Amino acid sequence: MSARSPRKGLTFSPGNHQYRLDGKHVPGVTTILGVLDKAALPKWAAGCVAEYVADDPDAVETLRSLGRKGMVNALKEIPWKRRDDAGARGTTLHDYAEKLLRGEEVDVDEELVPVVESALDFLEEWEIEPVLLEFAVASREHWYAGTGDLIARYRRPDTGHRGVGIFDWKSGKKVYPEAVWQLNAYAFAEFHGLAGDEHPVPACDGAFGVHIRADGFDVSPGAFGPEIFDEFVAIRRTHEIAKRGRGDWRTPGSGHLGIAIQKGTAA
């Protein structure tokens, strides 16, 4: 009996957010960009814990019942819970936006009504006509995958320019610079489509991060073109180097740093 040939094409598992290309694991764009230093992250995490302690002293006292170790572990989780909550809100916004673009009715939670109204204002003011919605992309040459939010025809209200752009919805504090490399990676991928149903990514002339807020929206144009994509490819290479250098944390010595030759008791 002959061995089964690898599955052709791109697949995505939402549960663990893993991509596979032609049967092999392939890193996602956001994972690749994670190799970049985020200098503000430690300050943000410390701020989350500090705000929690200052704003809810009764809850802090309750945590003391867990003992020192339990209390420390609970406080350490606060930034990541806030991140996960924000991620859930972002997913909800993406779902609403996709339905609005498809012309479907949306049943909106009351607290999110202002955000959805801001999204509608953006779609109207920029005269958005969707070309691709929530689309998976990949590159065999550079070995990466990802999921874009929107490619659409648009009209810039500030200049009147009409074109086809790639857009990314953002619901956090702002649009970060990494979004530019993210959008270029999606736009210059080799194909879009899952399970072997592969098509060229529509040509775009611009990239935009769309920050939707309850009181309005911001659209941030990003640098766009082959030279910016080349920068992403360099980051992809850096990600691969860092992965090899660090090795598998479960296997000491699997990276570039060998197993320590110990004398005495290790700390």
Regions found by a protein language model. Give the residues of each.
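Metal-dependent nuclease catalytic cores that hydrolyze phosphodiester bonds in DNA/RNA
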Residues: 1-145
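Glycine- and charge-rich intrinsically disordered segments
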Residues: 1-13, 18, 159-160, 248-267
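Nucleic-acid nuclease catalytic cores
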Residues: 109, 137-237, 242-245, 251-263
